[in-house]
């Protein structure tokens, strides 16, 4: 029976039973463990997404701000990227015109591949070699690449529901998450207006900002700047456009060319070129129920309900101009 090729440089080996995966870096092994445990401990505080590593979360956070810190330095090029890998690929492909080709030297073949591992996998087909074997008991299926084997191994993995009395088992993590949201989603009701939330943090914020009138303040962290904002979006927009001069989102409308630091700002600007969108928005707003008027701002934490006592809030006057 065939065995997996083992790279001597991959010193970080998975300790789970029947798993032979190994990695060259500790963080890659840590991310791999998520496959076995189903845990994704790094959660985004701006959306519902979760990640296996802090690096993945940091890269994801850039999608909210629109910030692309790695800029191409080639003359006349204004492209920027969220990672060094993206920048490197851009430079090699666009400016250096590098196209790597790996040619099969098997007699009568001469097929070309962009990646060396693709060629290596292809040669295994010529020699009828299937070096990557599934180690799950009673299976024994073999594949030409580790990627194909990993894809196959997912049929053996299941994610059992942790709720008592529920026998659901997801074949994929996304399937398990969808089940959790559909069947076991927690419903938290506001005792002041009966509005329902699915996360305790959102309910707390709702009570503070809607019923108690508290306004959260985000202060600019740049030295010498006293600007404050009531939303994280406005603060990010201020820092990117005013302090760092980054405006990555450009209006595609002919003859416009205005640039914005945040994607949301570009979308709002698009109404200028398409007034019909504004009419539709107004029509939608008129159909909504009128929101409750917030109470006077609360400036003393002692007036907050006991369950919100631990929150640290700044209730000073805010400014909203970048």
Swiss-Prot record:
Pfam family, one: TFIIIA_zf-C2H2
A biological process term (GO) from this entry: ribosomal large subunit biogenesis
Biased composition (Basic residues): 278-292
Polar residues bias: start-end ranges: 312-322
InterPro entries in alphabetical order: TFIIIA_Zfn-C2H2, Zinc_finger_trans_reg, Znf_C2H2_sf, Znf_C2H2_type
Superkingdom: Eukaryota
Coiled-coil residue windows: none
Record PROSITE patterns: ZINC_FINGER_C2H2_1, ZINC_FINGER_C2H2_2
Gene Ontology terms, MF aspect: DNA binding; RNA binding; zinc ion binding
Designated name of the protein: Transcription factor IIIA
Native species: Ictalurus punctatus (Channel catfish)
